[in-house]
């Protein structure tokens, strides 16, 4: 029953911008963040032996698409990630490397619209299309726009850095890179070394029951 009550408060906030004002917003954001952690633990956390996309081995795997594509969790992600980046000035669009970034960008876009903010979403392909318009970046044109690159989780920072470079090659300005879960394995350092501001909604140690990440 507590899960249901929490979700009702969260969904109320996603449709009523007036609820964002005052101390109630600060309290409810903590509730939303904890609810997101619970969803990740319940739906997306697996223990065992895994090879990550970076090639590194891990004793756990967080399959965030099980959360970001879940109809109950997506509005929560939108709210948490919006709060993470909403103070960045003059941002026009949100996107990243397909496919981990895609549902994150769309969740932010929809939540932002519900509170009167306008962010377009875009998708950075891994390879340029060879037919049609042969685009590398799908969605509204980001040429001359200020964008935030998002990712569900990052180990080395390579995926969001790749997306950022491709956005810049298209003519966009990258305001920041924001990830939902930082695995605390060097992504922050790599992204900041590459010259980008870095934001993370959660650390992997917020999710794992043990004190440090493997």
Curated annotation (Swiss-Prot):
Kindly report, in one word, the top-level EC class recorded for this enzyme: transferase
Which InterPro entries does its entry note? OPRT (IPR023031), Or_phspho_trans_dom (IPR004467), PRibTrfase_dom (IPR000836), PRTase-like (IPR029057)
Which CDD domains does the UniProt record give?
PRTases_typeI
- Would the keyword Magnesium turn up in this protein's UniProt record? yes
Q: Which UniProt keywords apply?
A: Glycosyltransferase, Magnesium, Pyrimidine biosynthesis, Transferase
The residues the entry assigns to the signal sequence are none
Catalysed reactions listed for this entry: orotidine 5'-phosphate + diphosphate = orotate + 5-phospho-alpha-D-ribose 1-diphosphate
Question: Where does the source fall among the domains of life?
Answer: Bacteria
Metabolic or biological pathway: Pyrimidine metabolism; UMP biosynthesis via de novo pathway; UMP from orotate: step 1/2
Q: Where does orotate bind?
A: 155, 183
* Cofactor(s) listed in the protein's UniProt record: Mg(2+)
- In this chain, 5-phospho-alpha-D-ribose 1-diphosphate is annotated as bound at 125-126, 129, 131, 151-159
What the record says about family reads: Belongs to the purine/pyrimidine phosphoribosyltransferase family. PyrE subfamily.
User: What NCBIfam families does its record include?
Assistant: pyrE
Protein name as annotated: Orotate phosphoribosyltransferase
Source species of the chain: Tropheryma whipplei (strain TW08/27) (Whipple's bacillus)
Source lineage: Bacteria, Bacillati, Actinomycetota, Actinomycetes, Micrococcales
